[in-house]
Amino acid sequence: EMSASLVGSEMCIRDRLTVTDTAHDLKYQYKWTLIVTAQFNEGLVVAYTRDGTTSDLGLIMHPQLTETYSGAEQGTVEKELISRRNGSPFPSAVTHMLYTYDKTDKKNILWVSTDDDLMRVETDYYEILGHKEDAFVYLPGKLDIRSLLNTYQCTMILNDGDIYETLLSRGRISTPVSGTETMTVDNGVVSAHSAPGSTRKPSTIFYDREQGKFCYGYNQTFYACGSVGSSPFDPGNAPGLRCIAGGISIDNATHTLLMPVSYTHLRA
């Protein structure tokens, strides 16, 4: 016997096998559930445009993409994921994407930003779950997404100079993080990781050029570094620098912010 039902984006097939022992007139029943998901596997999601205006998403699926991938014949390339599921592509170019996990709906999602929208896209069939009006509790007066980042238990969003950080367990973005009103993120560059705080704090570091100091954050709380006058490098008194890149270093632990050669290469 077999019965099927659609739960979210998964097809649940419940099978039952009955075996009859005719010698003793006994029936043995075995039940199991088979979950069938979408045809898309793990891979690299790429945003692209064909006409310079609209944009879409493609998925390159290959078990060893970064080591041996050498063309479509080595794996599967799925194109026009947004158009095929939603009826049309994004109306403008994609500016940022972030892969993360939605604890509320218990599914993997993509945050996708364009010049005038911020969307959540599920990764089974690439259906658009919501737009900027759904993403923000209070829609900002201006949408200018500069960064989308994974931090510890949170998603961090830089929009028009404001710092937002929302828990993975919350489906919507509220207001800018309290205490960050006077902070600015130079060039929108942040070094961030999502490791547990028991192993690595802080989860974010950035440079505030207006204050001339470095700032750091963890779990929706941000601080400006205090001055350390006796140190060769004073993170609380470092005016006139510019930040051009940031990330976690090759040791998979150290926050790194890259400054122009004329200043220095700083590791905080």
Language-model segments: residues:
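Conserved small/polar residues in nucleotide/adenosyl-binding loops
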Residues: M2, L6-D15, T264-A268
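Short acidic/polar inter-strand loop motif in beta-rich domains
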Residues: T22-H24
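C-terminal edge beta-strand
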Residues: Y28-N41
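Conserved, compact domain cores that house catalytic/ligand-binding motifs in diverse enzymes
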Residues: A47-S113
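Preference for solvent-exposed, low-hydrophobicity sequence contexts
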Residues: K107-R267
